[in-house]
């Protein structure tokens, strides 16, 4: 019964939002027409430089995440890629027609805000809005704010909603991007060359895993999506490239859960004229250097039931 009520409520919300969209279009306003908005600052940038920006006019773009008030004074939270900031809107400080339109905006709408940086009586860093422009209308409601998007299945299948509702997920994306960029710089500085090897191969080799199989129409042969980058990288070493690596996607037609995806990224590298000790140097220094991207050096990181402290340590032989 509760699920039926939830579905009914969702249908009603969707219909209300479609009605608002139609009303805008009937009034000659296309909420998807604006393709450019001049953003001068981001939310966290305003907060970090509040003393210098206080009293100045800035422009921000982002998603409405909450709305409060709706009389002569309204408050809302604007979220952009850097975080959230409060927007303060007064009817007597905006065009009255524009203010009335703003009151009909929904949570999830993409808006542009132009206004003055100031601090409210309660001390909240805010933007006193002069203009609030609807840039894109949201027809689908966001998960309610108190519980957010907690269903793991939905979080992984609708990652775009997860990114909106869970700052930690966005943080993970940022850390991964920094990690891959750092990894490339680190290996490049050691004289390694990044290469791209074929994703499709007539044989499945380099690892013990079940491959995905596809058919090459022109050659009329079955081919395999790679389960490792090993074979082609070794051929490059044979060809005279002394240090090579690849950050690439791997495909293994096996089990799937929240920590095991059939499509994933690896970094595989090979170097000539060295031995096990040469690879040990990379093994002992690279994890420590990479760990500092996510936390300060020597920080304890809790992983499951274990506590891990990454330090630069010498290799111990037994």
Spell out what each predicted region is.
Residues 1-318:
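Class II aminoacyl-tRNA synthetase catalytic cores and aaRS-like
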């Amino acid at each position: 019964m509760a699920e039926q009520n939830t579905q009914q409520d969702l249908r009603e919300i969707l219909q209300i939002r479609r009605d608002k969209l139609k009303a805008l279009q009937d009034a000659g306003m296309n909420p998807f027409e604006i393709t450019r908005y001049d953003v001068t600052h981001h939310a966290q940038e305003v907060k970090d430089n509040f003393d210098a920006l206080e009293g100045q006019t800035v422009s921000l773009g982002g998603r409405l995440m909450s709305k409060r008030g709706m009389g002569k004074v309204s408050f809302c939270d604007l979220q952009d890629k850097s975080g959230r900031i409060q927007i303060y809107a007064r009817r007597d400080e905006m065009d009255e027609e524009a203010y009335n339109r703003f009151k009909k905006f929904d949570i999830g709408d993409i808006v542009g805000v132009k206004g003055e940086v100031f601090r409210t009586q309660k001390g909240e860093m805010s933007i006193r809005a002069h203009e609030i422009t609807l840039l894109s209308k949201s027809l689908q409601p966001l998960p309610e704010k108190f519980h957010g998007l907690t269903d793991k299945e939905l979080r992984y299948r609708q990652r775009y909603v997860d990114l909106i509702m869970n700052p930690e997920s966005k943080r993970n994306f940022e850390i991964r991007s920094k990690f891959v960029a750092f990894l490339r710089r680190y290996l490049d500085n050691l004289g390694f060359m990044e290469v791209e090897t074929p994703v499709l191969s007539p044989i499945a080799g380099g690892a013990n895993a079940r491959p995905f199989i596809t058919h090459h129409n022109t050659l009329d042969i079955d081919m395999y999506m790679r389960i490792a980058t090993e074979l082609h990288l070794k051929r490059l070493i044979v060809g005279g490239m002394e240090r090579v690596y690849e950050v690439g996607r791997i495909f293994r037609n096996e089990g799937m859960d929240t920590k095991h995806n059939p499509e994933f990224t690896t970094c595989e590298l090979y170097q000539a004229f060295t031995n096990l000790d040469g690879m040990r140097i990379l093994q002992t220094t690279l994890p420590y250097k990479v760990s500092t991207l996510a936390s300060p050096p020597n920080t304890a990181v809790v992983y499951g039931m274990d506590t891990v402290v990454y330090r630069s340590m010498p290799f111990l032989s037994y």
